[in-house]
UniProtKB/Swiss-Prot annotation:
Protein name: Progonadoliberin-2
Biological source species: Aquarana catesbeiana
GO molecular function: gonadotropin hormone-releasing hormone activity; gonadotropin-releasing hormone receptor binding
Keyword Signal: yes
Compartments it resides in: Secreted
Any GO BP annotation: reproductive process
Pfam families (alphabetical): GnRH
Keywords: Amidation, Cleavage on pair of basic residues, Hormone, Pyrrolidone carboxylic acid, Secreted, Signal
Its job: Stimulates the secretion of gonadotropins.
Gene name for this UniProt entry: gnrh2
Modified residues (Pyrrolidone carboxylic acid): 25
Main location group: secreted
Amino acid sequence: MACQRHLLFLLLVLFAVSTQLSHGQHWSHGWYPGGKRELDMPASPEVSEEIKLCEGEECAYLRNPRKNLLKNILGRSNQKKNADVLARQLQKK
């Protein structure tokens, strides 16, 4: 009888743990945790207008913000270039 109780308790614990592990986010093809989508995929009808307008190197939406931060910290010589890019972006809007 005591052995059956231990077995029942073990099964209950395993069931509880397995249900907690299965609550993870389902990853669809091309999607990453947090709803972030891979941008290197071919264009689809779901692509927003902002992404469609961003087809050059100067697009702020497709840039990695960490890269920009690192560039700004390491070298201040690009300030004029950054100001020109910002001015062009403001003119486009």
